Amino acid sequence: GLPICGETCFTGTCNTPGCSCTYPICTRD
């Protein structure tokens, strides 16, 4: 889906549901 979750994942984790870390940003389908 939308590629940007509006979240970064410098710590390696994403807090936004449905998002995964593609360093250094969170992405989703």
From Swiss-Prot:
This is a cyclic peptide. There is a cross-link at G1-D29 (Cyclopeptide (Gly-Asp)). PROSITE patterns: CYCLOTIDE, CYCLOTIDE_MOEBIUS. Disulfide bonds join C5-C19, C9-C21, C14-C26. GO terms for biological process: defense response. Belongs to the cyclotide family. Moebius subfamily. Keywords: Disulfide bond, Knottin, Plant defense. The presence of a 'disulfide through disulfide knot' structurally defines this protein as a knottin. Probably participates in a plant defense mechanism. This is Cyclotide psyleio A.
